[in-house]
Structure formats: structure tokens, C-alpha cells
Amino acid sequence: MEEGISQEVSLIERFTSSPSFPSAMIAFGATVALAESLLILIQGESIENAVWPQAVRTLSWTFALRESVTLIALFSALFLGFCVYSSFQNHRGRHLAKPLQAVFLGLIGAVLASWIIFVLMDYRYLRGAFLLLPTIYGVLLLGSALAIRGPPRLPDSSQNWKEKGATALHVLTIFLAAWLVMPGIPALIGIAPSPPTAPVMGYGAEPGPFDRTTVRYAYELPEEVTSIQGPTEEDIEFSIYLTLPHLPEEPGIEGVPLAILFHAFNNPSIDSYTDWIDHLSAKGMVVAYIQYPTDVRPEGGDDFDATIIEGTSDWPHHVPRMLSIQSALLRLNEIITATPRDGAIDDVLEDLIIMPEHLWIGGHSLGGAYSLQALGMVQSMGWGNETLLVDTEMAAARPVQEEWLPNYTDLPENSIVHLVVSEDDMTVSQCNSALHLDLFDEIEDNHSLLLFIPSDRYGFPRLVATHYLPANEAHDTLADWAFYRRVDAQADWVVAHSRGDLNTADFAYANLIDTGMLTNMGKWSDGVDVLPLQVYSNPSESNRFADCY
């Protein structure tokens, strides 16, 4: 027994004393950090899908880190203090114990691997929005490198080529760590200007004044859709989520208007859009969140070479999705016109009817494009023929298939259109929304607007306008000012017109057309204006969108 233990100890000692020990531990740390993404890649997913879970976690971590700057600064000081002390001890020949060396080497590998994933996510999703996470990576990398090898020094002639290589790598690691740390120092020491806080009253504040209840209604997908569904959404029972406002007793109105919201590609869960839904419904409207299948695999779709022109595309995948949305809208019409109506709705609305003639319709990304097609579908039912607000956020290219082309020649006088793009959207082209605006030529210019949300990296946290601004996962100060303020005003305008409340309608209207009330984004803590929204009624005449035409 003792001999076996002795042999095991001998093997461990030989491993920790071998030249391969540092590289093996660094590789182990990197493997642990990459394990989830590697597993997803092995399962046949794309690189984008492989890093997506970590992208979502990164958002969560970063929002938490923003609230803990003092703790981060304290941790960084203590960690670096210990590592600098260990560095001096190393320089005097007193090296760290092997288990502690293994921890620091593994940490170096994990940090380097995590940083590589962060770079990919930053290019694809984050666009420089987050400072503290790379700063922490830099602190961990700097401290670990100092603790393991001591202060950096240049290679000298007394070293062999392996030693020179290790010394050079150590110097490069220190430089990389310093480069990661430097941008975050103003935030850590508290000298970077902070953005405006979310409004505490009025548009953009907490959703209100009404509480909400959500009821789910499944709908049947057409057979030609179910036969080509992919596996990523096979566990979903596609449904309409109806969110109902709790109005006071005897509100003195006939009914409440309707909103229809569509989600982005590969993101049917309502959990990503509850903030958007709450801001709409809390103003006094019923919101129908429609799930539709995005993982559909029509024949020839895998190697289809799409033609994308004038904000449209001819992907064959559009057809089964349009059939699904059409089925959902027919089911929605059944729900709101049923006699008697479902008890779950009557329990909340009592005698109030749902009035789709006063309509808000919109969506995010692919859902934004499909909301334009859905508007064409519901016009035949008289929906949106008295009040209409269209809001697409970072819309994708819409279907070009003839059977789904909308015709907006008979929109009501009370129509407002917001087609919104963000500066650092790396997912869809801004030209889509610019070209979609041509669909609404019959609406007067000040009612049909292309809105451009700029990024402002002046202070900390940075305000970076990405593709994901409307999703719960990216709900930050920029979203409060650039997005949720507009959503509140949009809902207020539709609800006010449904009630004949012209005073409220006029106030909301002033927040929705090309005025300072729409474009104002508040001020940084040092008094500098946050970059305002940019409004275009004729984007073809602007330099920013000239390449789209």
C-alpha cells in the first residue's frame, strides 16, 4: 500500500517538475473554459450558436459587475497585491508551492481562452459595450503571470532558445494584461462620467399604471410546416401569449386596443420580451405575443442562394413561417371575437371588448420584417383601420414572395411608423429598414420615420446600440432612453385615440414625431449631452443611407 502511494507521489512530483507542467496546466485551464462551446461544436452547431450561451452569461455577469465596481476594485487591489508579493519572492528564489502554481497556470489558460471567446462575442454582439469583464481578465492574467514568473525582463544571451521563448511569452502576457486593464481604470477609480439613470416618472419609467395578467393559447401549425420543422424548436407548443391589463372598475370606456408583437429569429421564448410587453400592456392595451417557428427546413433551403434586394429576400423559409403566422392571426381573431369569450379574458377585462381597429404592431429583427407582412394580412379583417402604430426594431429583410407582399394603400389618417436601426448592429443591414420605409409613402413624412440609435462611448458604462437592444437580456440605460420611452409613448398614443382622449394623444404624439422630445437622450453625469436619436423621413437623401439606394 505504502509503495503504491509512494509511486503515485513520485509520478506527481515528476509531472510538476517536468518542462511540460506549465503548458499542460495552461491547456487544462483553457479546456475547462472552452468545454461548453467545444461540446456544442462537436454536436454540429455553428460557432455562433456555440458561443451564444456564453454571450448570454456575459451579459448577465457584466450587468452585475456594473453594480459592484467598488468590490471589483477592492478584489483587484488585494489580488494584485498578493501576486506582486509572490513576484518579489519568486525573484529571490522562493517559488510558489506546486499546487498554487497549478492554480495560477490553469487560471492563465482559462483567462486566455475566455478572452478569445469574449473577442468573438465583442465583434459579433457586444461591440465594445463592456469594459469591466476584460478588465478583470487583465487583472487575473497580470497577477497570475507575475506570481508564476516574477517581474518581466527581456531575453538575454545567457538563455537557451527555450528560455528566451518563455521569457518573451512572459513579457507579451504582461503587455496583453496591461492592455486589457487600462481602458477600465477610469471606471474602477470612479472618474468616468456615468450615463443618465432611467426616468423615474413618465415615459421610460417602470411600466404602469396598470398591472397585467398573461394567458397562453396554443394554435395549430399547418401540416406543411410541421413536416419540415427542425429539431431545435421541437419541444415548443407554439402559442399566442395574451397579456391583459387590469383596468379599474367602470373605466368609462368601451374597450381596449390590441398590440401584436413578433420575436427575432431562433428566439421564440416570451422571456426575452416581457419588458417590451409590460410597457405596452401597462398603458391599457392587450398584447398578443405570437410565437412562430423559425427552424424550418424546406426542400432546397440548405444550399439556397438568396437574392436580397430593396429590403427583401427570397428565402424559401419565409413561406412556412408566413403560413404559421397566418394560422396564428386567424386563431387570435377567434379568441378576441368568440361568443362567449374565454373566461380567463373575462376575469380580467370583464365587459370590455378588445378593439383591433386600434392597433399597435411590430417586432424585433426577423419579427420586425414579419410584422410588416402580418399588417397586410390583418387589414382584410379591418384591424388597424382607425389607429395604427408600426414599430420595427432592427428589422431583417422581409419576404419578397408575391403572395405575402403587403399593400398599404388604405392606412388610416392616425398612422405613425417607426422603423428603427442601431449603429452597432452586426446582425442585419440598416438598409432593410431604410428601404422598408418606402412601403409607407402614403403616410405624411413626419409620421413615417426611420430612427437611428447612435452608440455613445463617452463614459462608463458605455452606451452601445447593438442588435439586441429590445431584448430583456440587453435592457440597460440606453434601452430605457432610446427604446422603452418610445414604447410607452406609442402605447399611450394608441390607447388615447381608442378612448377619444385627445389631450393625452397630443402629448404622446409630440414624443413620437421629429422633435427634441423624441430625440433627447439625457445627459452624462458631467453635463455632456448623450448623443441624440437621429430621425430621417427621407433616408434616401441622407449621406448615412446613400449606399442603400
Ranges and model annotations:
Residues 384-458:
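The feature captures the conserved acid-bearing segment of alpha/beta-hydrolase catalytic domains
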Residues 271-289:
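Short amphipathic alpha-helix adjacent to the substrate-entry channel of hydrolases
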Residues 173, 183-254:
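N-terminal cap/lid segment of alpha/beta-hydrolase-fold proteins
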Residues 305-352, 373:
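Alpha/beta-hydrolase active-site loop
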Residues 362-371:
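Gly/Ala-rich beta-loop-alpha elbow adjacent to hydrolase catalytic centers
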Residues 253-264, 278:
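Short beta-strand element of the alpha/beta-hydrolase
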Residues 132-175:
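Cytosolic-side transmembrane helix boundary signature
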Residues 445-549:
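C-terminal catalytic histidine-bearing segment of alpha/beta-hydrolase fold enzymes
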